[in-house]
Swiss-Prot record:
Protein name as it appears in the record: Uncharacterized protein YfhL
A single Gene Ontology CC term: plasma membrane
Keyword Repressor part of the UniProt annotation: no
Transmembrane segments: 4-26, 46-68, 72-91
Organism expressing this protein natively: Bacillus subtilis (strain 168)
Xref: InterPro entries: SdpI/YhfL
Keywords assigned: Cell membrane, Membrane, Transmembrane, Transmembrane helix
Record's bilayer topology term: Multi-pass membrane protein
Amino acid sequence: MTGLVGGGLMIIAGILIKLFPPKSINSVYGYRTRRSMSDQRLWNEANRYSASLMILSGLVIAGMGLLLGSNLFILQLILLIAACVITFMLTEKRLKIMTHSQGGDRSGRS
């Protein structure tokens, strides 16, 4: 059940960000990290990319939730947390590559 609910929430969040992307950098809505908020171009890409990853991760987690049913609650919770961490890591890696291709790290981090 955890995987189904968590996966569903990830899918909904991803769809909402895809349909209604935050237009400008803000501290309320969107993919907010130091790197993504350092530049409008990075902000736009972070929200676009992470929304796609959230939808994909949500589908995988929801599928696992359907397969596992209410069994293995801890495993479903671990998979949900892993999906969030992987989404964060892949998005930050993409932003870092974009930043370095522009000739420097604008966030002040290496």
